[in-house]
From Swiss-Prot:
Transmembrane segment boundaries: 10-30, 47-67, 82-102, 106-126, 134-154, 159-179, 195-215, 217-237, 248-268, 279-299
Free-text function comment from the UniProt entry: Catalyzes the proton-dependent uptake of 2-keto-3-deoxygluconate (KDG) into the cell.
Pfam families: KdgT (PF03812)
Reaction it catalyzes: 2-dehydro-3-deoxy-D-gluconate(in) + H(+)(in) = 2-dehydro-3-deoxy-D-gluconate(out) + H(+)(out)
Record's keyword annotation contains Glycoprotein: no
Topology of this chain in the membrane: Multi-pass membrane protein
Natural source organism: Salmonella typhimurium (strain LT2 / SGSC1412 / ATCC 700720)
GO molecular function, one term: 2-keto-3-deoxygluconate:proton symporter activity
Top-rank lineage group of the source organism: Bacteria
Protein name: 2-keto-3-deoxygluconate permease 1
Record key words, sorted: Cell inner membrane, Cell membrane, Membrane, Sugar transport, Symport, Transmembrane, Transmembrane helix, Transport
Disulfide pattern: none
Localization: Cell inner membrane
Family statement: Belongs to the KdgT transporter family.
């Protein structure tokens, strides 16, 4: 029985399959993951420490020379996501009012499209990308929260730049970079461990998803996810390539962060007049989180295969 080969037939399978299994268990038998001990620590609450270990391992593969390019890619993709989200969201708000179109409000669009799932990004660039793509997460982590969304809605005065959150993401990467650049043997040792961690933190991420939210969000929520991955992804990929990337990082960032579901609450607290719209946006964003967790690996895998074919043709030309 070749389980590994079967999983790898699915685009981004080492990320997607464990994530879906975790979500299914959390939806239908959540108590199975809450028995305590090592089981709960690993399968339910393990995402953050496992991603931290993953970033350290992958950071070991980043050379000091590659760091500026990684920062450029991360900054460009982050800015592109923000501008595209603002453009589409405020366009819908202007043309169709606060209620939006097809059930999609400007608040929901901006909150979903201006965020990205850091864990999903890390897994995908770890599998398909290069050291610069991995390093870009240090900047991309800035869009993992309500800050940019609130800027877009004119409520920037109610938010602060999460500097310590950025530092917290950087520390494992920097520790890995230091070890990898000081000792080539440590680089080889650590970088081999990165891919091993992907299915474990993918399962833990899935264990935080309840598939009932997909039903609550309905077709509008699924449409929001499609918009985030494919329309937003088109611009992210172009922006990534514009600054010398392969497009893989841009594709991998075309998702909605899990904590984006809490963004409408932050918006409602900043502007109580948006409370009703914000409440309606939450299930839509939750549906987008689930939809993009499935679609973004498909897009990233397609971009990676296309890039590999082009590289092969150029090599043989």
């Amino acid at each position: 029985m070749n389980i590994k080969k079967a999983i790898e037939r699915v685009p981004g399978g080492m990320m997607v399959v464990p994530l879906v299994i975790g979500a299914v268990i959390n939806t239908f038998a959540p108590q199975a993951l809450e028995i305590g001990g090592f089981t709960t620590a690993l399968f339910k609450n393990g995402a953050a420490p496992l991603i931290g270990a993953f970033l350290l391992c992958m950071g070991a593969g980043i050379s000091v020379k590659a760091a500026p390019q990684a920062l450029l890619q991360g900054g460009t993709i982050t800015l592109t996501k923000l501008l595209v989200a603002i453009g589409i969201g405020l366009g819908v708000e202007h043309l169709f009012g606060a209620e939006g179109i097809f059930g999609l409000s400007g608040v929901a669009i901006i909150a979903a499209m201006s965020n990205s799932n850091g864990g999903l990004y890390a897994a995908l660039v770890g599998e398909f990308g290069n050291e610069r793509d991995v390093g870009a997460i240090s900047i991309l982590s800035l869009n993992d929260g309500p800050f940019f969304t609130m800027i877009a809605l004119g409520a920037a005065g109610m938010a602060n730049i999460p500097i310590m959150a950025l530092v917290a993401v950087l520390v494992p990467l920097v520790v890995g970079m230091i070890l990898g650049n000081l000792d080539p043997h440590m680089r080889d040792f650590l970088t081999k461990g990165g891919p091993l961690l992907i299915p474990f933190f993918a399962f833990a991420l899935g264990a935080g998803i309840n598939l009932e939210m997909l039903l609550q969000g309905g077709l509008a929520g699924i449409l929001l996810g499609v918009l985030t991955t494919f329309v937003g992804g088109f611009f992210n990929i172009r922006a990534d390539r514009l600054v010398g990337g392969t497009g893989i990082a841009g594709a991998a960032a075309s998702s909605t962060a899990g904590n984006a579901v809490a963004t409408p609450l932050a918006i409602a607290q900043a502007d109580p007049s948006l409370a009703e719209v914000a409440a309606a946006a939450a299930p839509l964003i939750a549906a987008s989180v689930i939809t993009t967790a499935i679609l973004t690996p498909v897009l990233t895998s397609w971009v990676a295969k296309k890039q590999a074919r082009q590289a092969s043709l150029e090599k043989n030309a």
